[in-house]
């Protein structure tokens, strides 16, 4: 990434479905730590419907880091515990863009959304013990 390149953030919308699926599949190939059930069988129509539903809720978030109009990272907050009203944060960045502050930018923005716009009471985070990059980011 050159100095002239600027990363922007955008809320994922239904029309981003194909790009989101491509991003998630690429990240899954690069890291094997993205945990999305049935990722390989998700269709663009499925993802469009999911992104539309998320866009009208206050307990879910999908935010994209964009570079030259292409997604290079993603952060999600998904409601995981109805009783506790808790959401789980997940973040992933294409390997080519690691160590450039994109993950930190995404996490900070997700926390801001949680604190200012979310209807969730709690935010939780699970990290694989061997994922030292993620542990460092979240600390």
Q: Predicted regions span which residues?
A:
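Short acidic N-proximal helix/loop "leader" segments that mark the beginning
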Residues: 1-3
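A short beta-loop-alpha structural element at the N-terminal edge
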Residues: 7-22
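Acetyl-CoA-dependent GNAT
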Residues: 14, 26-94, 107-108, 113
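Amphipathic alpha-helical recognition patches that constitute DNA-binding helices
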Residues: 19, 88, 133
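Conserved GNAT acetyl-CoA-binding A-motif
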Residues: 86, 114-126
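Glycine-rich phosphate-binding loop
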Residues: 97
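Conserved active-site alpha-helix within GNAT-family acetyltransferase domains
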Residues: 100, 104-105, 116, 129-139
């Amino acid at each position: 990434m050159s100095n002239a390149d600027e990363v922007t953030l955008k809320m994922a919308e239904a029309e981003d479905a194909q790009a989101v699926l491509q991003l998630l599949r690429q990240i899954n190939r690069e890291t094997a730590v993205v945990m999305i059930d049935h990722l390989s069988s998700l269709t663009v129509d499925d993802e469009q419907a999911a992104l539309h539903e998320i866009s009208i809720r206050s307990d879910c978030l999908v935010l994209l880091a964009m570079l030259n109009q292409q997604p290079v990272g993603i952060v999600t907050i998904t409601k995981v515990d109805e009783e506790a009203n808790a959401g789980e944060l997940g973040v992933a960045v294409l390997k080519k863009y690691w160590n450039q502050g994109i993950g930190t930018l995404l996490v900070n923005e997700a926390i801001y959304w949680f604190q200012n716009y979310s209807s969730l009471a709690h935010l939780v985070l699970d990290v694989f013990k061997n994922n030292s990059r993620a542990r460092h980011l979240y600390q």
